[in-house]
């Protein structure tokens, strides 16, 4: 079943996707957040995940995402294992909620950072794909400031995602977040007018 009212929102780390989501929410749009679902699933399945990665990733029976991240962002094989485990579960949850929202006959957004990496429209049959874009150099600059990560760590994480320019070429609409918050608001408004 095609999700006629669903719009996938994607981007890379540091492109401003979270800020864009806040703008959309302030306009009254419903958002299904793949990352929030992933965090819930990590906790629900923490013991199975710990069986694979070792009990060091648990603290008082709670999964420590930083410790898990330190493992998976340094080892492509381990990242693949985690993604192969989580992505089908995330997809199941997202689609179940999306089918419910379809009944409202109003546009809503699926916030999926790894939209293209997990199969794009084959996995999530949305009407449009919107990319929140910022150049790789700007992503790195923002992540250095925001997350206080070392540049090597940032480059490792970026390497785990499809290149932002590839995503740009595959998207139906681009929200360019290379400037100010005021400009981002204008870009979002411009996009929302295309939905009318």
Swiss-Prot record:
Belongs to the CoaE family. Pathway: Cofactor biosynthesis; coenzyme A biosynthesis; CoA from (R)-pantothenate: step 5/5. It is found in: Cytoplasm. GO terms for biological process: coenzyme A biosynthetic process. Residues 6-196 form the DPCK domain. The keyword Kinase applies. Keywords: ATP-binding, Coenzyme A biosynthesis, Cytoplasm, Kinase, Nucleotide-binding, Transferase. One of its GO terms (cellular component) is cytoplasm. It catalyses: 3'-dephospho-CoA + ATP = ADP + CoA + H(+). InterPro entries: Depp_CoAkinase (IPR001977), P-loop_NTPase (IPR027417). It comes from the Bacteria. ATP binds at residues 14-19. Its main location: cytoplasm. Its EC number is 2.7.1.24. This is Dephospho-CoA kinase. It comes from Helicobacter pylori (strain ATCC 700392 / 26695) (Campylobacter pylori). The keyword Kinase applies. Gene3D superfamilies: P-loop containing nucleotide triphosphate hydrolases (3.40.50.300). Coiled coil: none annotated. The gene is coaE.
